[in-house]
Regions:
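Sequence-level motif detector for i,i+2 pairs with an aromatic at +2
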Residues: 1-3, 69
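Active-site beta-strand/loop signature of hydrolases that rely on acidic residues for catalysis
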Residues: 3-8, 19-42, 97, 109, ...
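Signature of WW domains and closely related Tyr/Trp-rich beta-sheet microdomains
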Residues: 14-17
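Short, flexible loop segments at the rims of nucleotide/cofactor-binding pockets, characterized by
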Residues: 6-12, 85-86
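Structured beta-strand-rich core segments of catalytic domains in phosphoester-bond hydrolases
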Residues: 35-116
Length: 117
């Protein structure tokens, strides 16, 4: 099993095709992307991952702020969101999922950006 974690920097922007090509070269079974966003480039990347077999996806995004950094986990196997008992106060900065792989496991991803006050 190959798991890749990658900070794609600012939602990927114009680099999403290069990011998708590099992920193709690595041939991961699961990808955890930080600084993923609800913007068109990031959404295009999610679609590209789905077309490459990473169709099971869970994201931690702020729909009210499309350009806010969040997280995406994409997998070849079904994902189940896990609700933590003591969740961080910033939900776009973490994502916890169960992976229904041949040997099931839990994956936690952290990323995003801190709230500025």
């Amino acid at each position: 099993m190959r798991v890749v974690g990658w900070n794609i920097r600012a939602g990927g922007g114009r680099r999403v095709e290069l990011i998708a090509a590099q992920l193709d070269a690595w041939a991961p079974d699961i990808v955890a992307l930080s600084e993923f966003r609800a913007t068109p480039p990031s959404q295009h990347l999610a679609e590209a991952l789905a077309a490459r077999g990473l169709a099971f996806q869970q994201a931690a995004l702020d729909p009210g702020q499309l350009s806010r950094n969040g997280l995406l986990v994409a997998s070849r196997w079904p994902l189940k969101p896990i609700r933590a008992r003591s969740a961080p106060s910033e939900p776009c900065r973490w994502l916890l999922v169960g992976v229904d792989a041949p040997a099931p496991f839990t994956l936690g991803a952290r990323g995003g950006e801190a709230t500025r006050e």
